[in-house]
A protein has these predicted regions:
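Disordered, acidic Ser/Thr/Pro-rich linker "stalks" and the adjacent N-terminal cap
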Residues: 315-402, 412-418, 438, 474
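Short aromatic loop motif centered on NTY/YTY
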Residues: 146-148, 262-265
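Short, surface-exposed coil-to-beta transition loops
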Residues: 116, 260-262, 289, 419-421
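Aromatic, loop-rich ligand-recognition surfaces of beta-strand-rich domains
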Residues: 378-437, 441-477
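Short, loop-centered acidic/histidine patches that primarily coordinate divalent metals
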Residues: 218, 234, 262, 269-271, ...
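Beta-rich carbohydrate-recognition and catalytic domains
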Residues: 1-92, 97-199, 208-213, 218-255, ...
Length: 477
């Protein structure tokens, strides 16, 4: 299983992701999210669907949506007549729902001119390919044609299907409405939900447990992102009251190294009768976020127990899909270069439910991320090796410490959604090298896999195209 007895399961995914939601169909968990590239909110990465059968080992292959070039900047003229450049962006996919053998994805698209809305896409499989249900999709600025219509002209649309089959959608700024029977349109006028706390809010979630409707809404943002909730015994749109106890049920835990637990989703696991909250974490600030998951617990009156987020996470929800010993854990890694450390200093409100006057409960915290080669063998999705920005031919080498027969290597690259090419070499003595595997065409997947490597003591991975970094390098006999 794992040589690291105290293994942490947060961060959940080996990539920078935000706004996660999870659905389970058959024996597979599907995770949807916003792909972060550290370019700010003006540009996002290629959207993908991460899949797992055990909630620990996650992978993806390619994108579930075609017809967009996410890396292309489009020129447009804004309302003030200024020339600008912008990108298509895919944000905050809601929980995918199944109806009559079709899968419905509600997701925010932002156009290059920053016009945005929540759209519904449909597919025959939960991992796509997904298509717009009407119109020609979304057209670049200046192109003739008809854009597909949005369900709502705002962001963070999140669907909810009640026990009687009626559908609802919730979006930012506490807005909500009924969905038509075909799930494609609003039915009637939207409403605004009254919450106990004021202030800007996004990333809403609705779920139902034992006859109680729970409306989760975010407050603040960045390192002070929190999740608050209201309860109703009436309906998804009415009767909400402030719960007893901490209505902000999830907030930063600096002692556990979790900052700004924000926009997320609730996943109910029927197999274990558990509720799991998935959420984004601050990372290094901006769009360097990562996905965390922790179990939710409830009091007898239905209120949510304050969730103290941690690195431990959830762990396996089904039998582990990887039982082979990972040779990397006993091996020595070194690289052509290592990126300089990155330090963040933030002020965090440590008591958001009852802040002390004059910012008395605001404290300063520091975190530093390093990018050493050894990070690729620590069973953590939150640490990585990255080559220096000036390194024009980056590589990373492993010494297995003795000659082993290697059957498979798995490479979990950084920014995997943007694609990589690479070359793998092997050596018995560390001096004479021969190529044993190659990815010559740009491929976006995680992990990349090299097989049938044979006897060797040393392996050297050259990253030819794509981001020069690895979250993990797993090695099996």
């Amino acid at each position: 299983e794992s040589l690291i007895a105290d293994r942490n399961y947060n961060q959940l995914i080996p990539d920078n992701l935000a706004d996660p939601s999870v659905s389970k169909f058959g024996d597979t968990y599907y995770l949807y999210g916003t792909t972060d590239l550290d370019y700010g909110l003006g540009r996002a990465g290629t959207p993908v669907v991460w899949k797992s059968k055990d909630f620990v080992n996650w992978s993806f292959e390619g994108s579930h949506i075609s017809g967009f070039d996410w890396s292309k900047g489009y020129d447009y003229t804004n309302d003030k007549g200024e020339k600008k450049k912008g990108y298509f962006r895919y944000w905050a996919p809601g929980k995918v729902i199944e109806q009559d053998g079709k899968f419905y994805l509600y997701v925010t698209f932002v156009k290059p001119d920053d016009k945005m809305g929540t759209y519904v896409l449909v597919a025959d499989r939960p991992d796509g390919p997904f298509h717009f249900t009407a119109g020609q999709g979304l057209l670049p600025p200046g192109e003739e044609g008809t854009d597909s219509p949005a369900v709502v002209d705002d962001i963070d649309g999140e669907p909810f299907i009640d026990d009687d089959g009626s559908g609802y959608i919730f979006w930012r700024r506490r807005n909500a409405g009924r969905l038509s029977a075909d799930r494609l349109h609003l039915d009637g006028e939207p409403v605004t939900l009254a919450t106990a706390r004021q202030g800007y809010s996004e990333g809403p979630v609705m779920f139902k447990r034992k006859g109680i409707y729970y409306y989760i809404y975010t407050l603040s943002g960045h390192q002070n992102y929190v999740n608050a909730y209201m309860m109703s015994r009436e309906s998804p749109l009415t009767g909400f009251v402030k719960p007893e106890g901490n209505d902000i049920f999830l907030f930063s835990s600096p002692e556990n190294q979790v900052w700004g637990p924000g926009h997320g989703n609730v996943f109910y696991d029927e197999g274990t009768d558990e509720y799991i909250f998935l959420y984004l974490e601050y990372g290094d600030g901006g769009t360097t976020r990562q996905v965390y998951a922790n179990r939710m617990e409830f009091n007898d009156d239905g209120t949510i127990k304050t969730l103290i987020p941690d690195m431990r996470g959830v762990g396996y929800l089904a039998a582990s899909q990887e039982t082979r010993p990972n040779l990397a854990l006993q091996s020595h890694f070194y690289a052509s270069s290592e990126k300089s450390p990155r330090t963040s200093v933030v002020n965090i409100e440590t008591q958001p439910n009852q802040p002390l006057p004059e910012k008395g409960s605001v404290k300063s915290y520091t975190r530093t991320h390093t990018y050493q080669a050894t990070h690729v063998a620590d069973e953590s999705n939150g640490t990585r090796w990255m080559a220096a920005d000036t390194d024009s031919s980056p590589f990373i080498t492993v010494d297995l410490k003795e000659i082993r027969k290697v059957g498979e290597c798995q490479f979990y690259f950084t920014r995997p959604t943007e694609g990589h090419t690479w070359r793998l070499e092997k050596s018995i003595d560390g001096k004479h090298w021969q190529m044993c595997a190659e990815q010559g065409k740009v491929q976006a997947c995680s992990p990349h896999i090299a097989k049938e490597i044979g006897e060797t003591r040393y392996l050297r991975l050259h990253i030819r195209r794509g981001d020069a970094g690895l979250w993990e390098w797993k090695i099996y006999e």
